[in-house]
Amino acid sequence: SPNCTTVKALKGKKIRSFGADLPKMHNAIGAVPVTVSPTEVYEALQRGTIDYSFLNAGNVESLRLYEPGKYSCGTAMTIAGHMIVIGKKTWAKLPKDIQEIFMDQAAKSQKEYLDWLVTGTKTSIDNIKKAGGVFKEFPASELAKWKAATPDLLKGWADTMKKRGYGSQAAEVATAWRAWTK
């Protein structure tokens, strides 16, 4: 549907969702979250199981989602959660110089990845348009309305972690995350 640039227009629309938090974001504006894996989105758009895919431009391009769903509306968000996890005991066994290499390379990789998200998104949008797709930006004013309607997901996560006995660690992560995303 071409009418996807307002929160009001998304009300009642079936939007591809996943996990515990994204459905809360969709419910907050009256949309209907539908769990669909990325590899099933093409067919879900084709059959009308979903109205919108809620995937980044790179995935829209690589999965050719502009074929069953000509209109791409966004970007409302990008998920950037790629990481390498090392257990505390293993980390403690590594020599300090190796730990420093890991930390240095992690910082470099993070910056390169975030820079790539910007350039990669632009390239994908250009390619979607060349293939006949239409990319419509979701206005900042509408995104602000969506954010205002959405519950504080980070607080919800921290509260859940506190119930599991990790309150101080969760508070530290939440504080760092809020500072990083300002």
What is the predicted function of each stretch?
Residues 1-182:
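N-terminal secretory/targeting leader peptides
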